[in-house]
């Protein structure tokens, strides 16, 4: 084991699928001697503990109730000396070694353009008069597809309330991180920690969906 990289996986296991096994297996197959932390999110069935490879995997039985966000912070605060962190959901299967992306401070493989409104809109794929088209779409089109807003007004209010715990603010547009799933350097997480971003902890699925947006906001400010 070395402190080059740490894989952090949030897991809620109820026995209905093999996601956590497939996820950890894919990491072990693509990386030499990886260090994997599985943070249990208060799973009703903990029998999976016995079926994970103890050579590479450490399970944190911490009864995490704050979804992926809580799992990420629990693992980072316990293991804060690694160079690179892979923050993953147990539904992810890695198909190849991604260490080439470790040269970046932050990597997200799926992201989406967001706005500080409910709903979204579809933009014609052209560079011609793009700024004017963007302005017109915001002004005239309440329903969108290519740019994603929030699902509910309550999510916006919760997000704005949580951001008050930090120096970050709600912009009009930004890139959100799907999942949120990402690879980042140690100093990226430390900066979030210094700015109290670890104080934003979702307690339900709707709030966790907001974290895709909030992580994106924090990373871009």
Locate predicted features:
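ER/Golgi luminal nucleotide-sugar-dependent glycosyltransferases, focusing on the catalytic module
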Residues: 1-221
């Amino acid at each position: 084991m070395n402190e080059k990289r740490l894989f952090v996986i949030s897991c809620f296991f109820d026995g209905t699928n093999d996601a956590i096994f497939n996820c950890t297996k894919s990491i072990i197959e693509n990386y030499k001697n990886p260090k994997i932390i599985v943070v249990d999110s208060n799973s009703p069935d903990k029998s999976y503990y016995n079926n994970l490879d103890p050579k590479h995997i450490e399970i944190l039985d911490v009864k995490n109730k704050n979804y992926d966000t809580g799992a990420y912070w629990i693992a980072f605060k316990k293991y804060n000396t690694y160079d690179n962190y892979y923050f993953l959901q147990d539904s992810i299967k890695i198909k190849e070694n991604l260490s080439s992306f470790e040269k970046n401070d932050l990597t997200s493989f799926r992201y989406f353009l967001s706005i500080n409104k409910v709903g979204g809109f579809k933009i014609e794929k052209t560079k011609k008069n793009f700024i004017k088209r963007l302005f017109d779409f915001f002004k005239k089109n309440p329903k969108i597809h290519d740019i994603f807003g929030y699902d509910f007004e309550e999510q916006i209010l919760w997000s704005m309330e949580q951001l008050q715990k930090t120096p970050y603010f709600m912009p009009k547009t930004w890139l959100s991180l799907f999942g949120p799933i990402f690879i980042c350097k140690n100093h990226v997480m430390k900066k979030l920690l210094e700015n109290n971003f670890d104080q934003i902890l979702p307690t339900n699925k709707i709030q966790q969906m907001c974290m895709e947006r909030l992580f994106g906001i924090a990373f871009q400010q």
